Curated annotation (Swiss-Prot):
This is Glycine--tRNA ligase beta subunit. Keywords: Aminoacyl-tRNA synthetase, ATP-binding, Cytoplasm, Ligase, Nucleotide-binding, Protein biosynthesis. The lineage of its organism: Bacteria, Pseudomonadati, Pseudomonadota, Gammaproteobacteria, Moraxellales. Its EC number is 6.1.1.14. GO terms for cellular component: cytosol.
Length: 266
């Protein structure tokens, strides 16, 4: 089983929308994976001022094969009185064999509904490689994000809530080559805008969160918020005070900083 890493690097995202975008991206990708019958263990969503990211753990190599029943003409139309295939029945069989199969009338089955009985064939559809499916899944999820007003940047015709600057897409330690939001995928991310502004390589999808910490970014929204709460409480306790932190304001502050450091004014 592998870990898929996706990171969308942008200009600063609107702080009042960041948590909503994080949750919507996670939910959309989860739904799309289920729709494609792709199993996984967990999706961990990250959101910081200049990035949205996901790690998807426990992902296999291929979709499972599936059975698709092909319905043909009615039994009455498919066979003549002698039990031989009519032109309608032959046409159905030829259509099944058009992709290289060598089926005969003995391979055909029958299905019935309230309108009658029909010839049919249970077609096995081989599962696709999951890394081939991920780029389209992720692009669809981005297209479906609840963004009231999208924008273009320069000559790029792809729209998003803010200009996109880089895309990371990996399966374990291998880049999944694709184009998302008009940008080629890679393994290059960026840290804190001032403390670690240069690109750095992600060597493995499982190392994402720790690598960002090494480059002065707490990528996990909830962890940043917990750090802010703990720091502010400590500062308040030092002067026997009580910190007043409305949740809406706390969410906004969490969305504004990569590496929170609380200060107490005199």
């Amino acid at each position: 089983m592998t870990t898929i890493l996706f990171e969308l690097g942008t200009e600063e995202l609107p702080p009042k929308n960041l948590k909503t975008l994080r949750d919507a991206l996670k939910n959309s990708v989860g739904t799309l994976l289920n729709d494609q019958n792709i199993s996984f263990d967990d999706i961990h969503a990250f959101a910081a001022p200049r990035r949205l990211a996901l790690t998807i753990t426990g992902v296999g190599e291929f979709q499972p094969d599936r059975i698709e029943t092909k319905k043909g003409p009615s039994v009455k139309a498919a066979f003549d009185d002698a039990g031989n295939l009519t032109r309608a029945g032959q046409g159905f069989l030829q259509g099944l064999n058009a992709t290289g199969r060598n089926l005969s009338v003995k391979d055909l089955g029958r299905i019935a509904d309230k309108k009658g009985e029909y010839i049919a064939y249970d077609l096995t559809i081989k599962g696709e490689k999951i890394t081939d499916l991920m780029p389209n899944i992720l692009q669809k999820a981005l297209d479906d994000l609840p963004i009231a007003k999208r924008m273009r940047s320069g000559i790029d015709r792809h729209e998003f809530i803010r200009p996109v600057h880089w895309i990371v897409l990996m399966s374990d330690d291998v880049v999944i080559e694709a184009t998302i939001q008009g940008h080629k995928t890679g393994n290059q991310s960026r840290g804190h805008r001032y403390h670690s502004p240069d690109f750095f390589a992600i060597d493995h999808a499982d190392h994402y969160e720790n690598l960002l910490k090494n480059h002065h970014v707490i990528a996990d929204f909830d962890q940043r918020q917990a750090d802010i709460l703990a720091q502010v409480k400590t500062l308040a306790d030092d002067v026997n005070g009580t910190a007043i932190m409305p949740q809406e304001l706390l969410d906004e502050v969490t969305a504004l900083v990569d590496l929170p450091v609380a200060l107490r004014a005199s």
